[in-house]
Amino acid sequence: MAVTRTFSIIKPDATRRNLTGAVTKMLEEAGLRVVASKRIHMSREQAEGFYAVHKERPFFGELVEFMISGPVVVQVLEGEDAVKRNRDIMGATNPKDAAPGTIRKELAESIEANSVHGSDSEENAAIEIAYFFKPEEIVG
């Protein structure tokens, strides 16, 4: 397996409940290494740009409002098959459907406040990483 990178956001519901460390611990225990991390308060423009792919979906406005409601932690994760590894440890989007031991099953509040975002492909990971990080901010 090749070592690859993926992108993760610890969402406002998790940072509000002081779960940044718990989420990061679960990511690291799943074999992922944090090679870049910063706590930010997304602007409306950042959130709308990041989630532009969902612009025509009925939940877009609520998603943007949620993502700007408090601080988030954006991270670049590295590991073998990082996208899959991250998605596996995150669990299903709906915490009710997530497997025991996953971030969403153990820490999420609801399908909307589901604690984490993770890239769905290596291609999207590269785009999402570049959206928030300069190359020199990523140190492996």
UniProtKB/Swiss-Prot annotation:
Upper lineage: Bacteria, Pseudomonadati, Pseudomonadota, Alphaproteobacteria, Sphingomonadales
Active site residues of this protein: H117
GO CC terms: cytoplasm
The EC number(s) this enzyme carries: 2.7.4.6
Highest taxon in the source lineage: Bacteria
Organism listed in the record: Novosphingobium aromaticivorans (strain ATCC 700278 / DSM 12444 / CCUG 56034 / CIP 105152 / NBRC 16084 / F199)
InterPro entries in the cross-refs: NDK-like_dom, NDK-like_dom_sf, Nucleoside_diP_kinase, Nucleoside_diP_kinase_AS
Assigned protein family: Belongs to the NDK family.
Keyword set, alphabetical order: ATP-binding, Cytoplasm, Kinase, Magnesium, Metal-binding, Nucleotide metabolism, Nucleotide-binding, Phosphoprotein, Transferase
Signal sequence extent: none
Pfam families (UniProt xref): NDK
Protein known as: Nucleoside diphosphate kinase
Compartments, record wording: Cytoplasm
Protein's job: Major role in the synthesis of nucleoside triphosphates other than ATP. The ATP gamma phosphate is transferred to the NDP beta phosphate via a ping-pong mechanism, using a phosphorylated active-site intermediate.
Chain positions recorded as ATP binding sites: K11, F59, R87, T93, R104, N114
Any single GO BP term: UTP biosynthetic process
